[in-house]
């Protein structure tokens, strides 16, 4: 497990709120999802092989996440039109949010922006129904972190029993 910088959203602390484009004409705020767990999936870029495999895996496991009433949100610095084409190509059924302008602002607030490459690190956060970070993980850039850690974290939430 890679270490997160001390500036990262810490386990036990409130998750930084944000409002990002989910479509060209709609924005989604993290605070709008209070009352249910949220999985934030920061990833470097649409169309890269590892990122494509990672989000496709989560798409296949949506019923597992939803068994915990969890919402999953993908976040990268790509623009909304790029996300739209990528989601359509991969047949994704969860929002991809554009951390595009200002570039990487949300990734920076979570402590997972890679300045040298101008992309988000491959990072996962599980946020509980009250908006508190309960688990976080940064994977090496070329490694798909899979879903086991996410599912374990969801299981450990106070109301982590499956519905």
Task: Please identify what each model-predicted range represents.
Residues 1-163:
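Chalcogenol-based redox active-site neighborhoods
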